[in-house]
Amino acid sequence: MYFRSRFGKTVNNAWLPDVFGNSWILPQILKKSGVEYFVSNKMSTWNDTNRFPHNNFIWRGIDGTDVYACVPPTHFITWNMPSQIQENWEAYQDKESGGQTLSMFGYGDGGSCATEEMIELMHRFDKLSVMPKTEQTGGTSFLEKNLKGNENLAVWDGELY
């Protein structure tokens, strides 16, 4: 309701990129709030004990409620360098079932964003045959294209940590 009243947009996705663990009750809360998609990040980048086995998947809550979920394979603060894009693709665990991988870039901590140089790099990647194919898109578009209706997604039934 807040985004609709302030910006004229209905938001159907929740992003908690800088959280180390997410409670098993969250899918139920998200779904009851009109949220279909969930994105978090720390499980794939900061957990040195248990490697989370999926990047694009369905997260099933404690009551059986499902939401689509994305845990990008690399950190949410990158400079969009070719080596970082390559690392993101190589670390992506759902190549066969999850559609594309999400790579976020920019100076995320402190409220900053992508620079002109980072965006220019994105435009140059298509000209490099050794680079994974990239596409610049918005979060909602990415989630809908790669998760919604994807019957090949794994189901994670439990907490995210």
Predicted region positions:
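Catalytic-domain carbohydrate-binding cleft regions of carbohydrate-active enzymes
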Residues: M1-Y161
